[in-house]
Each structure stands twice: as structure tokens, then as C-alpha cells.
Swiss-Prot record:
This is Hemolysin C homolog. PROSITE patterns: CBS. It comes from Rickettsia rickettsii (strain Sheila Smith). It comes from the Bacteria. GO terms for cellular component: plasma membrane.
């Protein structure tokens, strides 16, 4: 497990305190307003008036206001973690097995628990509950550690979801499709990030640094979920148009094959581009290596 120095911990604590102060200061007039009305339209009216009178606000405060205004039109579908990226544990797993699984596979503080298939999520556990149970030598199954989640549709507005999470006192929502199957996942952190900006933990920082790396003039390593436009800008070549039904590099690859390709598969995208699958599951692409036969910008 990674350990941070006292100096790093102090720096993080100061940053968190500054963020908390900023949010409290900014939301004070909003909180007071909601004591008088529950109308969403009036809520955004308050936000807009705050933005107009934002000359004395800091950059962080103005950014939060801008994010709040954008929240008016955003739905769960815009931010949810897709089904293929959900980390979950079977209900039949015992506590010792779960402890090892979380250490090796699941870098999050909360983990979904399902019965049979991912379409039957029964709740989630918090890692602190797990380690507390292990420390007190509790044995058995997971049921006594499971916390409740809520169910939401992809079309639900983010502000409505935030209010529902607060009412239900839970931090996780399972997004279901029209047939009741699990479509995705949204956490309270996802919603907060939409308002105050991205909140990175150590795992996020590792993923971000590996998302898109230009190794040399002819090789790029990329997360399959990086947008195609990022690659187009780097190589100076158009790879898709407005009529294509994909946005990511992984989507680009899948248009050339009939199923998710195995690790090691190489696919010619154009005369200059070959993409090799370097990480994948049976359901989705994770990472690819992009080879530029003519080098960057044909050099």
C-alpha cells in the first residue's frame, strides 16, 4: 500500500480545507434560499444571479458556479460509469476472500455486491466495514455488511439524483435500463466532481498518467476510452466524421471487427495507423498500442 509523507498529508489536508471553505461560502446563499422554496427553476435563478454578481469571487468559486449552471441540463447518462467498467463481488464470497479481492483488484472504498449476475445488485460494502469485521475476527458471509443503494434511470437529472441520495442517505446509485438490467453506476463523488471539479485519489492519478502516452515518434499507448479527437489532433489525420456512431479509440477499433478482439490482435485502421490490443476483457477494450507507420504527421 502506498504511504504519503507527513508533508504531503499536510498539503492535501490544507487543499481539502480550502475546498470545504469555498463550497460552504458559495452555497450559503443557496442553502438559505432553499429554506423558502423547493422550485428547481428558482434554484438556477439564484445561481445565475450569483454569477452576475461574481466580481468579488475567487476563480474556484466562479468555476463552481459555472459547473452548477451546466448541471441544469445534465443527466445520469452523461457521467455514469458503464456496466463494463463496474467492479463488483459475488454475494457468496466470504470475508477473507473479499479482503484479498479488494486488495488485488478493486481500488475503491466502496464495492458493489451482486447475487447471481450484475443485473441483481443487492447493495455495496464500504472497505472500512470489511476491515473492521476482519479486525474483530467476524466470520461468515457479506450480508451483515451490505449497505443499501438506490435505483435510477439514465434520463434522471443529476440535481434530482443528488437530492434523492441525500434523502435516502446513500452514496451509490445503480443505473438500470428499460428491462431492469444494470446499465451503469453513479457515486456521490461523481456528482460532486461535476460541481467542484475532479477529485483525484492515488488510483486516479495513475490512470490519468497512463491515459494517452506518446512513447516515441511512431508509438502511442492509449486507454481505449480516450476520444478519437485526441488521437486525430496528435497525428494530424481525420479518422471519423459526425455520422460515425463512436467517439472513442476503442469504438474506432470495434468498427473494424465483429467482436471484442483478443489481446495481441493487430488491426489496420489506415495506411499510416495500426492498432494493437494490449489489454481487454471479453466485454470491452481497455488499452491499445497505436503504431504510426509514417511517424507523427508523416515524419
Amino acid at each position: 500500500m502506498l504511504k504519503s509523507s507527513k508533508k504531503e498529508d499536510s498539503s492535501k489536508k490544507n487543499q481539502n480545507n480550502k475546498l470545504i471553505f469555498t463550497v460552504r461560502k458559495l452555497f450559503s446563499p443557496i442553502k438559505n434560499f432553499f429554506r423558502k422554496t423547493k422550485t428547481p427553476d428558482n434554484f438556477f435563478g439564484v445561481i445565475k444571479r450569483l454569477k452576475i454578481n461574481s466580481q468579488k469571487m475567487t476563480l474556484d468559486e466562479r468555476n463552481i458556479l459555472a459547473n452548477l449552471l451546466e448541471l441544469e441540463d445534465k443527466t445520469i447518462e452523461d457521467i455514469m460509469v458503464p456496466r463494463s467498467d463496474i467492479a463488483a463481488i459475488k454475494l457468496t464470497t466470504n470475508l477473507e476472500e473479499l479482503s484479498e479481492s479488494i486488495k488485488l483488484e478493486v481500488p475503491h472504498t466502496r464495492t458493489l455486491i451482486y447475487d447471481g449476475t450484475l443485473d441483481n445488485v443487492v447493495g455495496f460494502i464500504h472497505i472500512k466495514d470489511l476491515f473492521k469485521a476482519l479486525a474483530t475476527k467476524q466470520n461468515g458471509r457479506l450480508k451483515k455488511l451490505i449497505r443499501k443503494h438506490i435505483i435510477a434511470a439514465p434520463s434522471m437529472k443529476l440535481l434530482d439524483l443528488l437530492a434523492k441520495m441525500r434523502r435516502e442517505r446513500t452514496h451509490i446509485a445503480i443505473v438500470v435500463d428499460e428491462y431492469g438490467g444494470t446499465d451503469g453506476l453513479v457515486t456521490i463523488e461523481d456528482l460532486i466532481e461535476e460541481i467542484v471539479g475532479r477529485i483525484d485519489d492515488e488510483h486516479d492519478q495513475q490512470l490519468d498518467s497512463d491515459n494517452f502516452k506518446v512513447i516515441n515518434n511512431s508509438t502511442i499507448i492509449s486507454n481505449a476510452r480516450v476520444e478519437v479527437e485526441v488521437l486525430e489532433e496528435i497525428i494530424g489525420e481525420k479518422l471519423h466524421n459526425d455520422y460515425d456512431e463512436f467517439d472513442t479509440i476503442g469504438g474506432l477499433v470495434l468498427t473494424r471487427v465483429s467482436s471484442v478482439p483478443a489481446i495481441g490482435t493487430r488491426i489496420d485502421i489506415s495506411e499510416n495507423i495500426e492498432i494493437e490490443v494490449t489489454d481487454a476483457t471479453p466485454r470491452s477494450l481497455k488499452q491499445v498500442k497505436i503504431r504510426l507507420k509514417n511517424g507523427l504527421n508523416g515524419q
